[in-house]
Amino acid sequence: MDKRRAHVWISGRVHGVAFRAYTQEAAYHLGIGGWVRNLPDGRVEAVFEGDADKVARMVEWCRKGSPMSRVTEVEVREEDFRGEFVRFEITFGRWGA
C-alpha cells in the first residue's frame, strides 16, 4: 500500500464550529495519523499521514468540513511521507508551519 503525507490549510468558517474535533474523528475512523490546529488568521492547518487512498479521502472530507462549517478553500501541499505519527491529535500552542 502506498503511503502519503498531505499538509493542508482550510479557509472559510472553520473556527468555532467543531471543525478540529470532527477532523480528529474522521481521521480516527480512517486510521490516519497527524494533527490539526487553528491558525490566528482564521484558517485551520492539518497534516495527514497514512495509506494514500485514506489520506485522499481525508483531504476530500476537508473540502466538505464539519456540519456547521463553510469551507471556501483547501490548499494542499504534498510532502515526503515520514511515518512520524501513531495517532491523530488536536494541537494547541505555537502558530506557524
UniProtKB/Swiss-Prot annotation:
The active site is at 20, 38. It is an enzyme of class 3 (hydrolase). Residues 5-92 form the Acylphosphatase-like domain. Its EC number is 3.6.1.7. Keywords: Hydrolase. The keyword Hydrolase applies. This is Acylphosphatase.
